[in-house]
Curated annotation (Swiss-Prot):
Cross-referenced Pfam families: HSP70
Keyword terms, alphabetized: ATP-binding, Chaperone, Nucleotide-binding, Phosphoprotein, Stress response
Biased composition (Acidic residues): 597-613
UniProt-recorded name of the protein: Chaperone protein DnaK
Species name: Bacillus pumilus (strain SAFR-032)
Length: 613
């Protein structure tokens, strides 16, 4: 069975891992980094992904960041005259991760386990699965990030019974899960979170502070200047990271904008104490889901054996201090918070292929599921934190006499009224025989698969007629749309590969021109004019082809010149060999002459003991 890669598709950074020899291993990207920024940029039709896209984000308005925050919504971003959905942008990132995983493994990769925040609803999970499909990946399983982290942490501890709390503060989402580990079973007891809270928000409080301080000093609002704002964002992110290790950091942004008197610079010292003051509300916000998760699991903080921190933002000292205070436990720092989720996803891939034995993963649904009933009430069929896969049925009836159709309004959430919860979908069961209200028996069944994706069925018990849907959100893509996007993604991948080949061929051609010039210089006076002319003509022809940019022409001219250069190089080696031989012969002759000049001398051995007497 081919390898299944594990992908942590993050808001700010993504990571890919694979199981090798029973051990999960992070695959480094082309730049040698173990995580890749989740950033996509478009420039004159060319796509850039990762660090290269992030670096030019200040000057390129067609740069898309933190798209994960929009998954499962109808958000679209217009770039160079084309609208892109969050699924398509995520697919570009996934394609990039897939390509360098293939480069590392030396084989095609078609299957993946992708992680999502535990608190992602059905629409967000479905959108992630669609992104994988567009990228040419068969998504074998969608698993929750905290669960993946627990897998990576607990794989070598399966013989111990432990209750662990996973605190996962990523770039744009926040989750807490309580899990029980024992006998190879990873059972999620509860999960809670906030999909609109993450490291980006910690950056934002620093940005707001810088904007306010600069306005106070210079009377100019930098938040209205797009380019200045991007520089502020980069500086804020760096300052946040610095303050995890030092107590104060200098923020210096020369020529941030211009005033009446000329250019203005931003110079400011930010202390850790000030940063903690600015972000205190955010840290406190993370404590609510921690308490909720413990309550749902029916546990007190003292019953938690270990606290695991996941996500780069957990390096913030105030965050570590808050979780320590809340749970009374020193957070475990034995796992890399940036990589642990991808490692766990790779382990789950190994469970699917059978490479990892005796490990069972029992996940839960993060939100309650149900339907709207009379009076706009939300009637729950499946309570949150129910272990998945699961199914549940309940019988309902009509609300009016002679009602021949019922609307099934499927919802996800925790609020008592339907209007306050998230609509997953609607469908209709028709042709119900007319009868007084309350007589028809309508069975509504909910099924949640192992990926947390919902199927709903409604059946008229009297006629046996049924209607069912796999929930697609309002932003959900149809199969045709996905198919179209898959084709576009493949075409783009081909175009990207062609562009890469073009660059490589041009580089090789440029190198060959340089080699030719150097070889001709080294052979000056040692080869006849005709050979020199032949080489120069071929070199000029290749230069002209490079100027024109016709790939096939460059290849042909490069091959011609290559043959000539090989002949010249052979000649160069022959010349060098002749010279070396001549030197050797000259050296041997000189040694012989030196021998002829040697004079034999008589000598007498002196005995030290005799000398001393």
């Amino acid at each position: 069975m081919s390898k299944i890669i594990g992908i942590d598709l993050g808001t700010t950074n993504s990571c890919v891992a694979v199981l090798e020899g029973g051990e999960p291993k992070v695959i480094a990207n082309a730049e040698g980094a173990r995580t890749t920024p989740s950033v996509v940029a478009f420039k004159n039709g060319e796509r850039q992904v990762g660090e290269v896209a992030k670096r030019q984000s200040i000057t390129n308005p067609n740069t898309i960041m933190s798209v994960k925050r929009h998954m499962g919504t109808d958000y679209k971003v217009e770039v160079e005259g084309k609208n892109y959905t969050p699924q398509e942008i995520s697919a570009i990132i996934l394609q990039h991760l897939k390509s360098y995983a293939e480069g590392y493994l030396g084989e095609e990769v078609t299957k993946a386990v992708i992680t999502v925040p535990a608190y992602f609803n059905d629409a967000e999970r479905q959108a992630t699965k669609d992104a994988g499909k567009i990228a040419g990946l068969e998504v074998e399983r969608i698993i929750n990030e905290p669960t993946a982290a627990a897998l990576a942490y607990g794989l070598d501890k399966t013989d111990e019974d432990q209750t662990i709390l996973v605190y996962d503060l990523g770039g744009g989402t926040f989750d807490v899960s309580v899990l029980e580990l024992g006998d190879g079973v990873f059972e999620v007891r509860s999960t809670a979170g906030d999909n609109r809270l993450g490291g980006d928000d910690f950056d934002q409080v620093i940005i707001d502070h810088l904007v306010a301080e600069f306005k106070k000093e210079n009377g100019i609002d930098l938040s209205k200047d797009k380019m200045a704002l991007q520089r502020l964002k980069d500086a804020a992110e760096k300052a946040k990271k610095d303050l995890s290790g030092v107590s104060s950091t200098q923020i210096s942004l020369p020529f941030i904008t211009a005033g009446d008197a000329g250019p203005l610079h931003l110079e400011l010292t930010l202390t850790r104490a000030k940063f903690e003051e600015l972000s205190a509300d955010l840290v406190e916000r993370t404590m609510t889901p921690v308490r909720q998760s413990l309550k749902d699991a029916g546990l007190s903080a003292s019953e938690i054996d270990k606290v695991i921190l996941v996500g780069g933002s957990t390096r913030i000292p105030a965050v570590q201090e808050a979780i320590k205070k809340e749970t009374g436990k020193e957070p475990h720092k034995g796992v890399n918070p940036d990589e642990v989720v991808a490692l766990g996803a790779a382990i789950q891939g190994g469970v699917i292929t059978g490479d990892v034995k005796d490990v069972v993963l029992l996940d839960v649904t993060p939100l309650s599921l149900g339907i709207e009933t009379m009076g706009g009430v939300f009637t729950k069929l499946i309570e949150r934190n129910t272990t998945i896969p699961t199914s549940k049925s309940q019988v309902f009836s009509t609300a009016a006499d002679n009602q021949t159709a019922v609307d099934i309004h499927v919802l996800q959430g925790e609020r008592p009224m339907a209007a306050d919860n998230k609509t997953l979908g609607r469908f209709q069961l028709t042709d119900i025989p007319p009868a007084p209200r309350g007589v028809p028996q309508i069975e509504v069944s909910f099924d949640i698969d192992k990926n947390g994706i919902v199927n709903v069925r409604a059946k008229d018990m009297g006629t046996g007629k049924e209607q069912n849907i796999t929930i697609k959100s309002s932003s959900g893509l149809s199969d045709d749309e996905i198919e179209k996007m898959v084709k576009e993604a493949e075409e783009n991948a081909e175009a990207d590969a062609k562009k890469k080949e073009e660059i490589e061929v041009r580089n090789e051609a440029d190198q060959l021109v340089f080699t030719t010039e150097k070889t001709l210089k080294d052979l000056e006076g040692k080869i006849d004019e005709e050979q020199v002319k032949k080489a120069n003509d071929a070199k000029d022809a290749l230069k002209a082809a490079i100027e024109k940019g016709e790939l096939e022409d460059i290849k042909a001219k490069k091959d011609e010149l290559q043959t000539i250069v090989q002949e010249l190089t052979t000649k160069l080696y022959e010349e060098a060999a002749k010279q070396a031989q001549a030197q050797q012969e000259g050296g041997a002759e000189g040694a012989q002459k030196a021998d002829d000049n040697v004079v034999d001398a008589e000598y007498e051995e002196v005995n030290d003991d005799q000398e001393k007497k």
